[in-house]
């Protein structure tokens, strides 16, 4: 899962893997900025924390369990504000189970923002069809400010990714995106998402993404 890295943190021993937010020194790749560490099969990069996510009630988010308590779970939603999932808001919690038997530290979940109190403490719920623990698939991390572009007008961009690649995608408003399906198609979806993030300010992006997917599918022999 994605973690926060600081300038100077070692990211890779392969200098050819150096991506955005990194630098190479002595044949090794280090973080140049503070941000989210993101790794693909070929590259490592650091996603800036500028534009960090500010939660709103009803938002779908993807988070990582950081602490387990008797009454619920502390969840990192990559926001300056704390998030908590009460046991009463997790349908998988049963009377004969302990919280750490349902979700443990390091587990990833899809949840919704249920409430935000005046001190910006965030309460999450998993009582929604879209919510689930993430047991498989891949999590892609982008700048939260680019989420609307990944979704597209009236969901057009996300529909394109799903229909062309036949993958499941859940976009968290906090910049974490869950992708599940055939491994090769998931990899192409991940690449396409990064393309959208990088070129979010440009025109004609939907057509370029469609062409990119078509080309990458041909490269790996997908009809």
Curated annotation (Swiss-Prot):
Component of the archaeal exosome complex. Forms a trimer of Rrp4 and/or Csl4 subunits. The trimer associates with a hexameric ring-like arrangement composed of 3 Rrp41-Rrp42 heterodimers. PANTHER family: EXOSOME COMPLEX COMPONENT RRP4, PNAS-3 RELATED. Pfam families: ECR1_N_2 (PF22625), KH_6 (PF15985), RRP4_S1 (PF21266). It comes from the Archaea. SUPFAM superfamilies: Eukaryotic type KH-domain (KH-domain type I), Nucleic acid-binding proteins, Ribosomal L27 protein-like. Residues 58-127 form the S1 motif domain. Keywords: Cytoplasm, Exosome, RNA-binding. It comes from Archaeoglobus fulgidus (strain ATCC 49558 / DSM 4304 / JCM 9628 / NBRC 100126 / VC-16). It is found in: Cytoplasm. This is Exosome complex component Rrp4. The keyword Cytoplasm applies. The gene is rrp4. NCBIfam families: PRK04163.1-1 (NF003181). One of its GO terms (molecular function) is poly(A) binding. Residues 135-193 form the KH domain.
């Amino acid at each position: 899962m994605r973690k926060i890295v600081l300038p100077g943190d070692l990211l890779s021993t392969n200098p050819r893997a150096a991506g955005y937010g990194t630098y190479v020194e002595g044949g090794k790749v280090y973080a140049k900025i503070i941000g989210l560490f993101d790794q693909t099969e070929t590259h490592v990069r650091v996603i800036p924390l500028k534009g960090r996510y500010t939660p709103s009630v009803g938002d779908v988010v993807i988070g990582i369990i950081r602490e387990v308590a008797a009454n619920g779970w502390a969840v990192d939603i990559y926001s300056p504000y704390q998030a908590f999932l009460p046991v009463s808001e997790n349908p998988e919690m049963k009377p004969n189970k302990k919280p750490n038997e349902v979700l443990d530290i390091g587990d990833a979940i899809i949840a919704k923002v249920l409430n935000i109190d005046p001190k910006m403490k965030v309460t999450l719920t998993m009582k929604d069809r879209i919510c689930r623990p993430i047991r498989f698939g891949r999590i892609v991390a982008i700048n939260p400010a680019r989420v609307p572009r990944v979704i597209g007008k009236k969901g057009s961009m996300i529909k394109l990714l799903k229909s062309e690649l036949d993958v499941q995608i859940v976009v968290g408003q906090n910049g974490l995106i869950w992708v599940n399906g055939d491994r090769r198609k998931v990899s192409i979806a991940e690449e396409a998402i990064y393309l959208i993030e990088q070129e979010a300010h440009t025109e004609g992006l939907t057509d370029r993404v469609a062409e990119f997917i078509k080309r990458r599918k041909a490269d790996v022999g997908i009809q």
